[in-house]
Amino acid sequence: MEAAPSEKVPAKKLSSSENLDIGVSEVVTVDAAENNSNGIKRGLKTRHVSMMALAGIIGPGVFIGMGSALHIGGPVGLIVGFAIVSIVVFGVMLSIGEFNSLFDFNFNTHAARWVDPAFGAAIGWNYVIVWLTNIAAEYTSLTSILQYWGPHVPSYGFFLIFWGFFTCYQMLGVSVFGESEYILAFIKLLFITGFYIFAIIYAAGGIPHHKPPNLFKEMPLAHGFGGIVSAFVYAGVFFSGVESVSMTAAESKNPKKAIPLAVRQTFWRILYVYFGISISYGITVAWNDPNLSSGSKTLKSPMTIAIMNAGWNHAGDFVNAVILITCLSSINSGIYIGSRSLYNLAKDGMAPKIFKRVDKRGVPWVAVHSVHLFGFLSIMNYSTGAVKAYGYIINLAGVSAFIVWTAIIFVHFRFRRGWVKQGYALSDLPFKSPLYPFPQLIGFVIGIILTLVQGWTVFKPFAAGDFVDAYILLPLFFVIWLSYKFIKKTKWVSYEDMDFINGRRVIEPTYSNEQSSDKETEDGKKTSFWNRVWKEV
């Protein structure tokens, strides 16, 4: 049950004694409505949201784009670049967990409430840009993979086929989307695990008639500090999606349970996926392998290169098939998140009202089709080559991600200060960020540094086109912020005026005889032993 956004309702604060009597962990969300007040439907289960947090960080970039990052940064540069960016991501996820366990809004709405509506508009539009460019990048990957099998078919032919498919598929509703992402994420996880096993055998000399080189010893850094900086941008793009749990909150059946669970699991998934894959690539593929820097329109995955170098020439077909599945999953997620971001902007009056239109299935169809149209940007690889086009798009998406992440952490600082100043207890928060404010402070500082230095390589020698590509979104953020502020006459929100009431989920105490077992799902069904293990990791 939620307070309508347009209504002012009195805040109900639990006293310290009440908190001691019932326990903070025993507060549950009263939210049984199938549709929320926005018109979209609650069709995502806890397992969907949890898996989407995983699926969001296993995109085609893991299989394809990291080949470019390896070529630029070398094996050590790749690991260092992703390690630094992961610190920012962890701080962002803790902030989102605290927001969305209490309010099922997206972060541009949070920013509008607790900083400035104009600041919220700037964050929201930058996040839309993240996903517009991501969709184009994923289509570039998809068409490149398909050209591995059909080199004589033009890339735009493959693009048009799948563009038509996703145009129809996205209209089936959020429950279909959630179930498909759950299955695809599981397939990706299995495949990555299999490759880790292969990499260990390969590096240990377990492949007959093959002596692997010590790549970490022979060539740890490909291009010095510049290579590490370039790896930052790739990391920013490949990590894009972990914050998508903020988008799924409004369509989750139990956000209070689903969001904190997804946030807690993020650290281990980042460690397993990105550090695992960085090490695996570093010990199986040389940074100067000619296939990584090929100017052809077909991008080859380091996985494909590694397995073919091991002597399994036809294994590349299997690897490409799995990468194809990953591309389909990422495009599916990109359209979903991008369209919901645009829908939320329209709902908050920060985008044209037409994007608020929702069909009977709860799908914001105008936003879906508008966002999906930007997939046509991928067609430019027909003239520039997939590698070059992918690089252009990656830069735009990476810078947008850094800006949005840094802004989210800043909003969290404001939220915490206002929450305490208005007399609320931290124990009233369904999910409280551990070690606050240290993860956020570290992430905030690193986020600012990454935003400023990610285009460092364009200065030596100076390249005007690359400079614009690397930094154009930074001034654009301030242009949107100041333009909206001037047109709408918005004001900086003081701590005393922050709204912690409207839209806040109503919580009620659950006493011991009413508590549901941890061995039950949100539907009241018993969970298996393996599902409970999965929740812990």
Curated annotation (Swiss-Prot):
Q: Which UniProt keywords apply?
A: Amino-acid transport, Membrane, Transmembrane, Transmembrane helix, Transport
GO MF term (any one): L-leucine transmembrane transporter activity
Q: Where in the cell is it found?
A: Membrane
Query: Per UniProt, what is the membrane topology?
Result: Multi-pass membrane protein
Q: Where are the transmembrane segments?
A: 52-72, 76-96, 157-177, 183-203, 219-239, 267-287, 318-338, 362-382, 393-413, 462-482
Q: Does the keyword Transport apply?
A: yes
> What is the residue range of the signal peptide feature?
none
Q: What processes in GO biological process is this protein linked to? A: amino acid transmembrane transport; L-leucine import across plasma membrane
Q: Which GO terms describe its cellular component?
A: Golgi apparatus; membrane; plasma membrane
- State the similarity comment: Belongs to the amino acid-polyamine-organocation (APC) superfamily.
Name listed for the protein in its UniProt record: Uncharacterized amino-acid permease C965.11c
| Species of origin | Schizosaccharomyces pombe (strain 972 / ATCC 24843)
